[in-house]
Structure formats: structure tokens, C-alpha cells
Amino acid sequence: MAHIKLDTLDVVQRPGTTRRSNSNSGRSSACSSGSLSPVPIIPIIAISRDTDDSESESEIETEPARLFQRRMSIKCTNNLAAIIKEGFLLKHTWSFQRWRRRYFRLKRNVLFHAKDFQCDVLDEIDLSDLCYFECGIKNVNHSSQIITPTRSLVLCAESRREMEDWLGSLKTATTPQRPRGDSFLIEQHDILSNHHHWYATSHARPTYCNVCRDALSGVTSHGLSCEVCKCKVHKRCAAKSIANCKWTTLASVGKDIIEQADGSIIMPHQWMEGNLPVSSVCAVCKKTCGSVLRLQDWRCLWCRATVHVACRPQMAVACPIGPAKLSVVPPTSVHSISTDDAWDVASPKGNFSPLLVFVNSKSGDNQGVKFLRRFKQLLNPAQVFDLISTGPSLGLRLFRHFEMFRILVCSGDGSVGWVLSEIDRFNMHKQCQVAVMPLGTGNDLARVLGWGSSCDDDTHLPQILERYESASTKMLDRWSIMVFEKAIAVPKTPKMSITTEQEALLTGMVTSANHHLRFIVETNDTQTLISSTQSLCDTIDDLVGRISEHHREDEQLAVKCDILRQKLNMLLDALQEEEMGAHSGDDLIATIRSLIARSIPQTPGTSAPLLNPSISIEKNEKDEINTKERRSSRSLRSSEKEALQSRANSVKRAIYNVVEHSEPGRPKRYQRKLSITPFEALKLPTTASGDSTPCSSPLPIIPPINIISPTMETSRLTCISPLPDTRRDSVDESFFNSISLPAPRQFADSRRSSGVPDVIQEIEEGANGETVYRIGRMSLSGGANIDDAGNRLSPCSDGGENTPTERKVDFLRVPILTGEPIVDPLSDYRPIEVFERTYYMNRELDRGKEGTEEKKGDIEKEKSSGTDVEKEDNMPTEKQALVHICNLQVPGIVVTPNSQNVYTSASLTIIDTDAQTTNEQSSSEEIAGEASDVLSAISNEECSVASEIFDKQDAGHTLGDIIQSLDASNFTHIDSPETSDETEAMPGESIMDDISSVLGHDITYALQDNTLTDDTTTLCSEHVGPPKPPRKKSLSALTRGHSHPRRRNSSPPRIPRLARMDSDDNPQQFGFENIVFEIDNRCDDQKMREPPRYCSLAQFVEGNDIARQSFKQLMLEQHGSNDNDTEYPEQQTPTNTMTNLMATTSEDELSTQTAIKIEIQDVDATMVRNINSSMKANTILTTSTSPTKKSGHGQDISVVVRPPTPLRGDSVKPSGSLLLDGSGGAISMAMGCSSLLGVRAMNAEIRRHSSHAPGLAVREIDKDKDRRHSGFNPNLLTLDPEHARFLSSSPAASRRISCGSLFKKNQKIATKRGYGLFSVRFLVVAEPDIRLATLALIRPLIPLPNEALPNLQTLKGSKSSLFMGSTLFGFDQFAAGDKEKDEKGCKDKEKTPTEETGRKLPIINPLVRLPNWPNLANGGGFISKCLLANADTLCAAVSPLMDPDETLLAGYHEKCVMNNYFGIGIDAKISLDFHNKREEHPEKCRSRARNYMWYGVLGSKQLLQKTCKNLEQRVQLECDGQRIPLPELQGIVILNIPSFMGGTNFWGSSTKKDDIFLPPSFDDRVLEVVAVFGSVQMAASRLINLQHHRIAQCQSVQINILGDEEIPIQVDGEAWLQPPGMIRILHKNRVQMLCRNRSLELSLKSWQEKQRQHSISIQRDTSSTTSEHATSTDEVISERECYVLLNFIEAVSSLVKWVKFLIISHPALQHDLYAVACRASEALESIHPQGKLLEGPSLRTKLVEVIDSSRQLYDDACTLLRDRGHSLILREDLETKLSAALANMEMELKKCSVQKCIDGKLRAYFNVLAPNEEPDARRKSRPFWVRLRSGSTAGQQAFKPPLTNTREAANNWSVNEVVTWLETMQLSEYVDSFLKNDIRGKELITLGRRDLKDLGVVKVGHVKRILQAIKDLSEN
């Protein structure tokens, strides 16, 4: 229906405007055109037929709107001004208040709009006199209104940000052009100009326009108000208003500037006329000013003073600025803006602490806009910024020149982090202090800082600002979230997920095909082969049929299916060729032929041309391979099995191609290049994998079916970071696999792991014995290797050319093993796994299976098993199988058959060197045995040693040659001191580190062990030393008749080229350990000739781990060395020789094997110090009695606890001497001089037992030398698999001690203590990560009585306990007595919390190591008690990481900065879902209550879905370098503050005094790591103090995200999906935060109250009459004091009465209290003898005695009731009355004060004011002594005793008391009204809202305050 507008009778066409008519518009000329027409326009009524063209305002008003609308065609606008902004907005229309979506285009001074952007004609609005403003107070619909002289539009944007962008663009379009048009100048102009900022609002009282002075229209006085100065205008007058808004700078003050004579500028008042607040009082005459009838009187915008027009000249010129003077930046102090976009500030006189305010207008239940406006009204508008509009950068740039200032962030935690990040960018940490106002949802940081959980009311903002002014400062730690986003390919196991039946069937078929392929390749049974082949064909046919049925139109899938059939036919052809020889005419042949005929592709003609031509080539190659030889049996030779295996590989890959193509939504896990895998990988695993299940996924995962892949299902990352790996082993302990990060394969540092190189070398031996190096490249098809010439390389050396007694292999020639049939076939980088731990065990188990053949000593068996590698159990022909291995170009080492003196059990291998070998082995046979230890010691960390490092080694180089030559190699690591002559020598670096950085630490350790001889103490040099006397030969040398003394598997003899190394005189041949210390053991003059060499750090390139620059080629100049050795100080050690108690290999004793070495102290021995080499003595041998002597009661048993450590001892120094006697290997530990003895506890140790071994003394290292070496001791027992699950650890990389290392020098490391009948001595060697749980396993080994072991529950970390100390390195003065320890313990109490506990970081929860954590029983077992009682020792410090620098952080980038907490898993998933919900439906998340509700809903959703289940298998956690074993969890939270996700103390409060953890704080540079087991736990932590989920406290965290799936992560509530890679959390910096100081607030409040009372009393005294003034002296009690005195007498009398009654009714109580009550009663009687109060000065003197006695009575009564309240049973009425009497007495005593006057007498005075305006919350429940009672019925009741008899007292108030009461509430403006109406106490209590209105109290807030105060008086 058309709308008739009556306001358009006077149509005035603007001059100079031409109206165009467009005939194509289809509109009437009356509405659309202003041009002349034949029909004259009658300007009486205008009917608008298109209702959309008549706009309205937010309220229907009668303001004129022009009829004629100018329109323009866009076809003619090509030459007009550029478009400033365009887009769609909602436009408010008349019809039913609807919103229509319209297209708007903004140009300079013109706004166009149309229905769509494709319209040719647009409506034009002239913006020459523009006025725009917001339409809403709250941030609801983001609407704004545009008013011009001709038009009025109401527009709505989708968000406030978009609305402000449009308003800013309108401002830009209407402001004049500037020379610099950047955004900063525009924002700057907006700040510095005094333009008003309008918003539409209504008013509750008559309001007048400041432009036209008329009243605003409507009953609600609807109009526009400036959000800064509260200027009121009509909408039509807004464009006419002058720019006189609140000043911002000195330039904006203009002509009002007042300058003093000295040149200083005074801040003047800035007056705004009219519209004063209700009941405003003139600052001059103290009378009411303002009017509701007209615009009159003035108010100051800064100090908020009001003044009459007549009184204004009498007002002081200077403005005091107001209550927030300390925070306000006066505009007179801001002179200009300098060239760096910062203010030039002149600090005002007096106290000045400017406040910079950032408000997030979207936060706080959409109250941010209200706070933004309120802050602008209180402060300088240039101090307040909207984060949504301008961000933090503008404000920080402007405040850059302030020396110190405060920042107030009014928002949630996310905005606080944004501001802090900008502070980082501007580097302003030292000059700003940050406070937080909680406007967000969680507000965790505000809670911790003391600012509360929310702030919704802006009415008390001045009082809130005062709190921030009195705040104290604390430092907040900030942490960098460093991210290295790199896909880490980890084999995935079948995931536990909800799948459909079709997906489950598909997965089953793929798995079935995998198993059949395995049987085809491995089986020796013909029937099994036939059945497996037939089943395989049926399975593949069914699989192809089902997939093709669902993808009939997919041509690529059809091609892949044809390829699969082709591959299957090739496999069947291979089987047919295999069986043609031995089984011709068999049923097998017929079966295979039928299968081949059935498997022919149905469309060969169409699919063949589409196949890759390389397939036929590959087929021809494989046919040639397979047809070379025919088999005589199913037991295939290696080459034939290789061919058959290649066929199986092809079929498997074809299956995967089909499956992956049919599942486009599935993650492409298998699209990686293949690596060649040997036949050995086909063997089934000996043990099943663990019961671990990976994370669930919404997508079904087809189980990988690689039957040839070398990696396991449970492979873990152990080498992706320079942090040790102590991850919980959820699978069999035999396997420690690794997946490596991509790194340059030629230069893989030991801190990183690298995969198999693309180019490997095969070593083939010719007939002449020379080693031939052939560079080969891998065949991606799984077939043969092809060299550069295109010739096929044999998978192994030609067997015919090998000698029957030896076979040379490379010492790094590693067989690629598989542990599980279900693996990922397409991993990008293949690790080479050799499991040191199970090598010997499995070898002996294999021998045991072939027992009869082994006993016969078959020579052919020995030949076939020359490659002594780890084998699986279920391969019958593995002894004959030739192993295809990946060769690394290192000279070969000969492997021998198994030794007969090796005895192997489950986890212990004993090599008996006493065994007499009847058949002496040849030299080559002896050498052949060398590689077993080497092969077994190769770590999963570093197997891809580059061929370039060992390039051009001559043939015949043995392992020892390689090792010896590494020291003087031309290629060295950049970490080595040899690489640089300029850098400075770093302590703790050695050649061993350089070797280990190339070979890997595990290899290095094994090489050290293998090359260790009984001359280890000899120092080595590069030149041959002088002749030495012949050494005593070792047992192995004697028995074999070899002159080269050596241990088993030591270095073989050298070739003639290195003849000098072959002699006994060369010390360098004696092992690695000599090489390690060679540099420091040179003579002093040699050191002086050579400049010091220092280590430089390796260089890294992005995307890789180490660059080629990390290796240098050197030409070392050789120097002679002196024979003199550096002397080392001796250590005082008990002269006892300890015989080694060997553990047997029986099953019962094996089950009790632990990391504890038991030694029986038998006879005395002498410690041997090393003799100078010039004395020609290397060792001194000691003898002892026979080790077979049985221990009796007179012998001492020593138990050496050698727990495993994640450090492996490579970063600590040797601590003592190791003495091995000649008869039994008795070992004595000496206390170290520098640090811990690094013990590398291997998973399977080699125990050598020899009664003829010569003495071996490792001499002590110089204290001044900070050299590191591997203290690997092969003579230590290790853990069995049962306990190694949580006690073992496998380091991943080198650990370098930084300058901030926690290891200290000169600290003892071991101690002894005897227990029990056998005098057992527990020699505890302190390790950084000691596993004290092994102590529980001592009992099975030693028959100790119960009292022999200490009470571990009572050990509080004292140094007298078994584990010697609360700190790991605090073993000071072990010989000191208990008295000294007690004295030291007392001193510790005076230290800080950290020093008091003496704990070092990281502090790891000892229960984490337990397999069943966190599901521990309440009582706990013996192990748990050991762990908890000795947690200090367990959680002691470890070697920290090297100081973070660019080297360790290469490839990382800072994702964000953490201030509060970091979460990964379920909590981040909930936050991410909430964020997505809020972005999708912002209207549903506009209140804090709704947000909490959504969090609950999303958390409950996770309770059912569990999308983050089994997160422990997708992430790895490292705390300060220690790998943390993770239980089954759903999330990990890292806390910096003790508040998480809305106020939850997720760490839990510490209640125990002996808590092993430090109290959490946000300024201690310590992070708290906790586990999240589910949403139920997160909800329960809000109510219950949970602590069982604590993991650790540390200073750095690394999280490795495995796989290829993104994981949700949140930082301070901001969540996102993080790709796989590594995350490091490192300390970034600290920022000053303002914390609420309640004690200072109370002090200030009390001081201000006293000042107010003093001023009131002065005013009262001056206004009182002369007679009243004469009586109101200090000597005479005033009328008001007399009233208080009467109440005091009443309270004392009541208390005396009920105390006496209490004593009488309970005679058992003490009678002293009765005497005190009598004394108080007598003193009370003395002040009113005969019922009349004393008069004059004597009354005050007597009152002193009454106050003292009554206070003593009160204290004694409270003490009695507190002590006896639990057992005292009172009558209910007596308890109630006694409680009330005590409460009243407490209140009255607060009003009393005793002062000493000038004459020396004590006088009593009373406080006449009400002491409690806000009653204490504790008074509302029960008195404190009642609350202490338990079980009392009265104590359980909600008892509220009356504080005072306030209602009765208020009834007796006079007018003066009522006035005082008003003044205490800061309502002094109503004093005159109450005095005029004679309002006394009785009238005050009965006042209502209408009465207050009659008294002039019309302000709503004041009415509420007075009524509430009256209500409190009545209730009390």
C-alpha cells in the first residue's frame, strides 16, 4: 500500500542541481525525476508507490525528508572519482520496519545505492553536509544512521568491524584531501580533531538540544548524544554542531590556553552548557543548579564540577581534572606528534601515571561499547582505543615517548595476548605495565591477577580506576610457541573408529590379501602354497569386483584394476616357473594354470595401451631373473626368492593403488616413493605388538599390508629432536624403531636421524680379494638394483667368490628388518633398525632351535650364517638365506660364526673368557667375529653415514683403522675443535662428540666397548711412542695364541700400510677411550705452540637438519708429543676389593634382574693411581681371593644401584676409578671429583666373566678439564623387559651442557650405608633420572630382614635416607653426622621455597613412569611408596638443553606467544568447536552465560565422540629434554598460570607440606604440564582438587606431532588445527603486569575515611553553638560518645552475664575465666556507681580499665571456646546467646580506643561513626570458634548473630547522626534537605521511595543506595 507523505508540501529544488530522466527506469516522473515534464507537478501530496524508496529513521519522526531523489547511470561514470568503498548493506525501509539488502558504492562526497551491483541506474546521495552516528547502545545489530539535508538512511552491517569500516570510509569521503593519506594520519586526525561522535539514544528526563536549545522530540527525548562529551542534539541539528568535543591535545585547546608567568601552561576547565545531572550542586555557592525546564548552567568535562552561570566567574581557573587525575593525560601535556608518529609529551607537575586503555568492543556480553564510551568520558579520548577498529599499534606508537605508563586491556585473554605481542614488536617491555579488565568469557589471566572473573557494570568505573592506580606489579612469563611444520611419516596401525560394514569388508579383504602374499613367499608346504594362491586370486577378484561396482564410470580406476590383474598374472607366472622344475605334471601346475586363465583381464585390448610402458620392461627384467635357475625344491635360493618377492611387491602396490583411488576422501598415506626391502623383511615377528591403539579418526583407515616394509607398526620417533627419548614403551621391548626427519643424507648430525640414502654402495669382492665399490641406485619396483652403467647388481656378493671360512661385510651393513606384517609400504624415508638388545638373545635362540646341528658344528651351516644378523624365530631356512643389506661405504669387517663361550638368557648375555676353545680359529675367523657387537650396537638413530665422509678408504681397512683414522680424518664435523682456529674452546667438547655426531652415539658407544683393551689407561698420540715393555696378555690372547692382546670383538690387526698401528707400542690401537682424551693429554709446550681450538655450532638450512657447511676438510699439521702425562689427584677410597657376584641364567633369577649390581665386599685392595708413562708402567695389578668363596656373615655386601638414565652419561664426566682385579673382576667405585659417572645402561648387556683378566684401572680425569666421555660400563646388570617398560630410555641425540648447566663441580655422587645381618652396603650412584622403583626388587636378590630396608614412607628426602638427599647433586659431606644434617635442615627453612626444597628442574611426577599410571590404588605398592618417598631424588635435575639459539631453532618459526596456557587435544578441540560456532552463529554467543553453556554442550559432545582418544600415540612429550611416557589420554595442557578455561585450577592446590612440586606461579619461569584424560575430568576439576594428572614442572617443552593428521591446539583460548611437526615452548620474555593489591586498597580506604571524618568533625565543630562547643572538649564525653558508651556498657554486661552462666553450668571448665568476668563486672560498676555515670575527666580514665578487662574477657572466652569447643556440649539457647554477646562485644571494642595524653594519663575515646558500612562476610555465618566445632547441631545451622543493636540505635539517632550517616555514604548533597525536614532516626528507617523523591533524591542510583542502607539498618 502506498504511503502518503504530508511533509513535502514545500518542495525546494536545490540550485545548480540538474535532474535527469531515464525512460528505461520504468518509474513515474513524480518520484524518479526532477526534470520538467508536460504535466505540471502539483506539490500537494506525493504518493510513493515504491515503498523501498522512502527511508525512515530508527524512530518515526516528523523531520522533513526531500521528495526528489537524484539518480545516475553508471554508464556515464567512467571519468568520475575513484570508488572508495563498495559492498552490500541492509537498508531500513518503511514497510513493517523491514530490512532490505542493497548494494552501496561510495565515492568522494557521493553515496550511490541500488538493488544489485548489476543495476545500470543508482540512487545518488550528496554527502556535503553529512551527519552519521550509531543507532544502538549495545553491540547488537551494528546499525548506523546517515543524515544529510535531503536524505536519512539507516544501514546495518554484518559486524561492528564492517560498520566502523563504512563509517570510517564516509569520514574519509567527506574530509578534505591531505598530503599524506595513509591510515595512520586518518586515525590520527580522528583523534586530534574535536568532532563529536554521535549515537542515537533516549533520555529519561527532559533534555535540550545544545545547538537549537529546544527540547528533544518525543516523550523519551529521543535524539543524538556524543559518546565523549554527552552533547545532546537533534538529528537535524547534528550537522550544524560545532567541533567543541573534549580536548585531546594542546592544539585542540585553542584560545582557552592559560599560560603562567613562568611559561607553564595551566589546564583550564572545559565547560558544557545545560543538561546537568540530577541534584547537581554548584561548586561555588553549594546550591542546586541545573534545570529541567531550559538549557542553563555549566559543567566541566574534566573535573565534572557544576556551576551556576552567575558563579562561573568566581570558579578557580585551573581544573583539578577530577578523581582520575593520576591516570589522565592532560591535553596541555600533549604538544604535538613527532616524526616517529609518537606524542611529544611534557609531563605535568605532581604524580603522573598515564593510562592507555584498549577496549574490545565485542567483549563482555557486548558491553564493550559502553565501556569504550565511559572511558572516553573519564579520560582523555586520545587515551582510549577500540581494538576492533584500530588495534593496539596506534596507541602504543602514540605513547612511545612516555617514560612509564600503564596499559589497561578491557577484553578477554586473546586480546591481552594481542596487546602483549604488539608490545614485543615495539620493544616497550620496560616502560609499560599491563592490567586486565575482565570483559571476556574465561578471563583466566584477570582471575590470577586478582581483577575478578567479570566486570559488567560501568557505573563504578571511577572506583575501578582507583583500584588500578593502587595495584602492585608482578612479572608474567611469556613463552614462544615455536613450530616446525614438517610431515613426519609414521606407520599407522588400524585405527579404532566407527566404520561402515562396507569399509570393514574392504579392510578385511586387503588384510587377507596381505597374509596370502606372505604365505606364498614364505611357505615350504606345497599344499599351503596352492591354497594361499587360490585364496589370493579369489580375494583380489572379489576386491576388484566390489570396487568396480561402485565406480563404474571411473576410467582411471579401471586401468588400475587391469594393472592389478596384470601384476597378479605375473606372480602366478613366477609360481608356475618355480614349480615346473620339481613338480612337473603336478596338481599344482594345473591349479596355477587354471588360476592364470581365470585372472586374464576382461578388456585386454583397451587397457593394455593405457599401461605404463615401464611395466613391460620391468616384466622382461624380472622374467630374465626368474628364468636363470630352476628350483629343485620349494626351499628357494636368495635370487629366486628375490624375484618372487618382487612379484609380491608389485601385487601389493597395485592393491594399494586401487584402494587409494577408490577412496578419494582418505588421507593419502601411501603415496610416497618405495624403498627396496630385502627378503629378510618377509619374516614374521617373534612377538606380537603391544595392546596400544592409535587415535581414532572419523575416516576408516585401511591397514597397511606391506609384507616387505622394514618399519614396524609401533615405530616411534626417537631422533627427531636433540632431546632424549624416554617414551613409554607400549609394545614389546625388543623393538626400538625410529622414523627420521628428512635431512641431507650426506651430512646427518647425531642430533637428528636420517633415513636410508637414495644412493647406496654395494661392496663386491672379486676373486683377487679386492673390495670393489659399486654405486647403485634402488629400483622402485622392488626388483634388482641397477648401477650407473645400467647393469643389474646382485643383491649380495657372489657366493662363489667368497672363501668358505669368511665373508666380508661392511660394519655398517645393516639388514632391514620388519616387526609386523601391517606396515606402511610407502614411507618416504626408511630407517634401518638393528636391535642391540635382542641380537644376542635371538641368535642364541636360533641356535637352540637347531641344537643338534649346532652341536655337530656343521661347517656348511657356519658358512651360510656368515652374516651374523638378528633373525626371527619362524623362518626355517634363515641360516641359508643370503641377506640383502643396504651397504654404507665403509671398509668391510669380517663376521664369524657364533662363539661357543656365550651364554644367553632373556635379557643377559655372559661371555665366559675362561672357556677353553679346542679348535683355534684362524686370524680371519677371529676377525670375522668382530662385527657382531658393532652390528648390534648400531642405533636406530644414525645409520645413514654418508659415503662422502669415509670416501676412498683402501680395501682391507678394518673397523679399528676407521676408528683410529677418524681422529685425524680430513673430514670433521663443524662442532669439532679442529674445524676452526678462531673459535674458542668450549668446555665439554671432545673428539668423541665429533665422532658421535657422525656415527651416532649408540654406534660410538659400541665402538668404545669393542676397542677397549686392558691398556685403556694409556694416553695416545698421533705418533708412535717409545718402546714399552711387553704387556701382560689378556685371556683371549693367551688362549688363541695371538700376540695382539684384545677383548672379544676388539679391532683386528692392521694391514701393512698401517703397520705402525699394528705394533704393541702404538697406544692408539688400544681403543676409542684413548682417543677421547688425546687433545688434553698433550704436553704443555705442544699446547702452547698450537692456538686453542674451539667448537663452532653446526649450520642448518630450512627444511633440513644440518647443512653441508657443518663439515670441513682439514689438513692437520702433525706434531710430536711428549711422553709426560698430566698427573691426576688421587681419591681416598675404602681399600676393599669387591668380588663380582655373577647372576645365573636360570628363569627364577632372571625374573628378578634389575638395574642393581650386587657386590660382596670380601678383602682389602688398594686403589691404584695411574703412573706417568715415562715410568713405563700402565697398570698395577691387584689380586684377591677366589671369587667362588661363599659369602658369610662376616662379609660386606654392596649393592650398586645403577639405574638407566635418558642422558646415557654422554654429557657428564667420569666420577671415579674402576678397578678390576686379576682374579675375578672385583669392582670398586671411588667418589668422583667432578660430576656423575655417565652410565649408559644398555637394553642387553654383555657380561664378561674371567678369572684371569688383568687389572684394569681407569684413571681419574683432571678437575680442570671439562671433557665428556661415554661412561658405558658393560659390567652392569640391566632391566628385564617387564620393568624396562617404564624404567628404560633410549637417547635420541647428543646432549650438550650449556653455560647454564645444572651440573656442578666438586660434588659427591655416591654413598654407602649398611643394613641387616649381611652388612649390605647400598652404593647409590646418583643419576639424573634415577629409577628408584628398582629398589623394590632388592629383596628377591638378597635375603634381607624387614628392618634392613629403611621405612621408605617416612623418608622426606633427608640425606640420611637410602637415596641420599632431597636433591640429586646435594650429596654434601656424607661422612657428617646427623647433627650437622639437622642443622643444615634448619637453615634450609630460612630459604626461599625453591632453595628450601633444593629441587632442580625438571620435576617429573615419579608415578608417570609406572605402567598403570594414573590408575593407581590408594594404598599403593612398595614401588609407589619408594617413588613418592624419594621423589626429590627421582625428580632431580638433568642436564639442560644447550642454550636456545638459531642453530637449535633452525627451521622453526614463532607461531604465537603463550601467556596463560597451551592445550593440545580435547580442550583445544572444544575451544575450536566453540570458535567455529561463534563465527557461524554470532547471535548465539553474545553473552557470557550462553558461552559457558556452549562449552558445556561441546564438552558433553566430546564425552560421547572422543575424537582425541589415544592422543599419546599421536604425540610425544619432552620436558627439559626428558621424554615423558604418556598414558592413555585425550589431551595435554601446559600451564603458565594457575587458571585454565574459565577459572579452573587444573594443576590443583598443594595441601601437603612434603609436596614434591614447587607451588605454581606465573613469574617463576616454570611450566606445569598436566594430562587430560577426558571431559569428565575437566568438569570435575572445577569442583575437586585433582592432582593425580600432574606430569611435570619444567622450563621448556617439546611436543612432536606424528603422522599426517592435523591436531587441534589452543593457546590462551585461541584454537586452530596444527599440521604434523614439532612444537617447542621456550621462554620468550617477561612483562610487567598489574595485580590487585587489596591490602593497599584497605589502607587507602581507611586513611581516606579518617580524613573524611576529620573534615566532618571540623565542619561540625565550626557550625555548632557556643554552649555545645564549650562542652565538647576532650575531657567531657559528648552526646554522640555517650550514646556509644551506653551500647558498650550493654555489651559488656551481657558478656559478663553469659560467661558466668557458662562457668556455672560447666564446672569442669577453668575457673580463671570466672575471675576475669568478675573483674570486668567490678570495673563496669565503677563507672556508674549507684546507677549514675561519672562526669568529667574521671570517666575517660575509668573507662580505660573497663575496656582492658572487657577485652581480656572477650579474648579468654574465645580462646576457651576454640580449644574446648569440639568436646563441649552447650545448650542451644546458651550457645546462641553467648555467640551474640561475643559478636556484640567485638563490634563495641572496635569503637573504643585508648590514647595517652600529654599529662601521661590514659584516656578512652569512642568512634561515633558506624564502623561497618559493609558487614564482613564472615559475620554472616557463624563465629569463628563455632565454625571450628564439628558434629554440633548448632554449629551446623546457619547461625547469624546480630552485629549490634543497630535498629534500636538508629531509632534514637538525632538529625546530626542522620547527617553523618549520609556523609559516610558520600551523599552530602542531600544534607540540607534532611536538615530542613528534620529527618531523625525513626523517620529514616521508615523512609520509602516516594519520601526520598519528596526530599529531592531523584537520581535512581542514589535512591537505591539509600534504600539499601536503610534495609541493612533494619535487618541488623
Swiss-Prot record:
One Gene Ontology term from the biological process aspect of the record: phospholipase C-activating G protein-coupled receptor signaling pathway
Annotated CDD domains: C1_DGK_typeII_rpt1, C1_DGK_typeII_rpt2, PH_DGK_type2, SAM_DGK-delta-eta
Biased composition range(s): Basic and acidic residues: 623-644
Subcellular localization(s) per the UniProt record: Cytoplasm
Domain of life: Eukaryota
This enzyme's EC code(s): 2.7.1.107
Keyword ATP-binding: yes
PROSITE patterns, per the entry: DAGK, PH_DOMAIN, SAM_DOMAIN, ZF_DAG_PE_1, ZF_DAG_PE_2
Residues annotated as domain SAM: 1853-1916
Gene3D superfamilies hit by this protein: 2.60.200.40, 3.30.60.20, Pleckstrin-homology domain (PH domain)/Phosphotyrosine-binding domain (PTB), Probable inorganic polyphosphate/atp-NAD kinase, domain 1, Transcription Factor, Ets-1
Listed GO MF terms: ATP binding; ATP-dependent diacylglycerol kinase activity; zinc ion binding
Role played: Phosphorylates diacylglycerol (DAG) to generate phosphatidic acid (PA).
Family: Belongs to the eukaryotic diacylglycerol kinase family.
The protein, known as: Diacylglycerol kinase eta
Organism: Drosophila ananassae
